[in-house]
Amino acid sequence: MNILITSQKAEIAGSTYSVVYLAKGLAHRGHNVWVATPTDTLLWRLLSDSPVQLVEVSFAFKFHLPSVQKVKKLVQLHQINIVNAQSSKDRYSTILARWWYKLPIKLIHTRRQLVKSLGLFGQSTFYEQGTDAIVAVSKGVKQSAKNIGISEEHIKVIYNGTPAEKYQHIDPNKVNLLRQRYQIKDNDIVIGCVARHKEQIQLLRALTEIQHPVHVLFVGIEERPKFRAVQNRWPAPHRVHFAGSVDNREVLHHYPLFTMNVLPSTIEGLSQALLEAMALGVPVIATEIGGNSELIQDGVNGLLFQNGDANTLASHIQRLIDDEDLRENFSRTGKKTALEDFSIDKMLDHYEAFFTELLETKQHH
């Protein structure tokens, strides 16, 4: 297959890494893969040393004519037969390119986050009429797309995957340096939270009910003034560390420090951070929202709580502090979930089968 993947929004986020795994994986399986994205993006940097062919397209705004024309040229020059758009502005450009130039392609949009709003008037109709299918990375994302008017039969669920090989390069020396930086002792309880724009304050509120002193390690954000007011109410001398924004290789070296990983998110599609924690054997607690409840079976390979319910979050944290056997059980079952049930190979198998099916239906017309 000749496949063009487009993405205008490619900053430090799990979704960017998911696009990288898809593009590289399809290229390694022998498909010709082009990725159209702005040059100053993380996506460009991550793919620059790979068999994927990169093309600079700005997708500066939704009706950006030069981007529409570039998509047309790419399709015609390379005889592209599958176009897979990943973010909002390139979704518009790809639909317009196909309509205006009557391009003989199959066009698929991928949704990686819960769809929160209808957007522009008629946008859901525009997306459905303009594409052959929409891929949702979880059933939760599919439901949110249905809620804004996309018909069920137009949406295909293909879960994100995580590549086992990325966990084989964790350097124990780097982990020890981080342990020293944060002054973590061997028996300390460390609650990790790897996320950018989530409801991290829920975790801080939950700690007002935890008497046992813990470390909290936020990876992905800086300290914020609103956090300080909550910390002042803590009954125990919990220690909070903010690692700020770090690249994925460095993020991975933080997980071995964690006793547990908490993800207090509100719009999760299918979290790479949860997959990473589970793959590395870290017990997980997450909001029962989006794809979180498809990754985590409550009480089997992790724990779930309702968004905003700091009391239940606190009791889950206390339970994992107290019960080492449960932690070991979640570690084992979580690892199996991430590396077997949500493997990269499974994800790529599903994309290949779906793209092939779409191309075959095209040939029947």
Model-based region annotation:
Residues A13-Y21, I189, C193-E209, L303, ...:
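A conserved mid-protein helix/loop that constitutes part of the nucleotide-sugar donor-binding site
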Residues A36-L42, T162, V194-H197, H215-R228, ...:
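Glycosyltransferase donor-sugar binding loop
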Residues A36-T37, P283-A286, I296:
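Short hydrophobic beta-strand element within catalytic cores of glycosyltransferases
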Residues V75, S245-V246, H253-F258:
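Short alpha-helical donor nucleotide-sugar binding micro-motif in glycosyltransferases
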Residues I105-V135:
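A conserved, positively charged/aromatic
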Residues R228-V246:
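Nucleotide-activated donor-binding/catalytic signature segment of Leloir-type glycosyltransferases, i.e.
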Residues T266:
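Aromatic "clamp/platform" in nucleotide-sugar-dependent glycosyltransferases that forms part
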Residues Q297-G299, L303-A310, R319-D325:
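Conserved acidic donor-binding segment of nucleotide-sugar-dependent glycosyltransferases
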